[in-house]
């Protein structure tokens, strides 16, 4: 259903920086097989998720919204991507960001009115969820880059307390202010993905000792 929606709407909304439908389907089929075989499943088993293009994924480009990083393919996953995979998520692709989550505007349009901005910098993540192209997504905020797109696109966005979600493998902008965050269409959806990502990570020196508490 998500891929059908993307085929219909992506030419207008332009939420994706990178999308491989065949790979997305391969992940979904593998999730189906795992379920049929009675193997253990995670809290996001088979759920389609998008990741902002400033967060590393080993099997997809991460270009930070910049021509300077065109074609860049990280050798390893970010902590966020690894946690999502371990939870069973289907990582659909990478969502559009302004350049380095700061400067040159991205191509994404507001799905409710294509003449309007979806907000930035996490524009693709918010617009894609609002347009039903994915169920959940991950963005980031240094100034207002999570809460602004959520407001503009009419969905729920959660920017948690600093040090709650690991930034290991995320393009840095301002260390004291960089926050990963999540988008969903319901509060229950936000809680589901946030619980997966709120895990202490020694690779991020600013992580709280018990990020899931409180």
What feature does the model see in each segment?
Residues 120-123, 150-153, 160, 174-178:
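Short, solvent-exposed loop/turn segments at the edges of secondary structure
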Residues 131, 142-168:
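Glycine/threonine-rich beta-strand-loop-alpha-helix active-site module
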Residues 25, 155-157, 182:
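Conserved hydrophobic/aromatic beta-strand scaffold that supports enzyme active sites
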Residues 159-214:
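A short helix-breaking turn/cap at a secondary-structure junction
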Residues 75-79, 122-123, 153, 185-188, ...:
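Residues forming well-ordered secondary-structure scaffolds
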Residues 1-143:
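Gly/Ser-rich catalytic/binding loops embedded in alpha/beta enzyme cores
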